[in-house]
Amino acid sequence: VKKQYFDYTGGADNGASISEVLDIIRSKGFLAGGKWYKIDGYVAVDWTKKELVKAAILIFGACPIGIDLPSAWTNDAIWDVTNTGIVGGHDVRVCGWNEQGCFVSSWGRIYLITWAAFTSKKWLSEMYAPLAPLWYNSDKISPTGMDVETLIADLQKIGGGIIPDITPPPPPVPTPAGLGE
C-alpha cells in the first residue's frame, strides 16, 4: 500500500485528498497481500452533524477523515479545541464514539477527538463513508446485520445528510444442546 501511495504522490509524502484516493480505490483498487481490493463507492459525510457521524460509523464502520493537524494533537491522547498552529494535513480513521467525542486510529494508536473539535471546520476538512465488499463479505451481510441493498440505500441517505432508520438485527438463536447434531 505504501508503494502505491508513493507512486501516486510522485515518490514522496506530498499528501493527497481522501476523495482522490477513494476514487483510485474505487476504479483500480489497491494491492495488499497479493490481492486487489476495491470499494463499491463512497459519499461525503457532514461531520458537523454529530448524529449523522454516529450513523455513518455504525453502518459503514471506520470512516476516513481529513484533519488539519494542530501541533498540540501530536503529543496528546485527547485531541481538543486548541490555539496551536497547524503542522500539516493528516488522514485518520474514525472508528467509534462516546459522549466525549470520536475515537480515531492514527500512528498505531487510538486517540479521542472531542465533539467540539470534531464538529468544527477548523480542524476537520473532509469525512467519507465508504462501502466495500470487505465490509459485507460473500454473504452480503455487514457485521451490523444489514444486507448490501440496504447498505447501498443508506450510503445515499448519509451522503444526502439523512440519518437512515437503523433497525438492529435479531439476535442469533442458539441451538439447544442435542438438536442439530
Give the ranges of each region predicted by the language model.
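Catalytic-core signature of thiol
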Residues: V1-G180
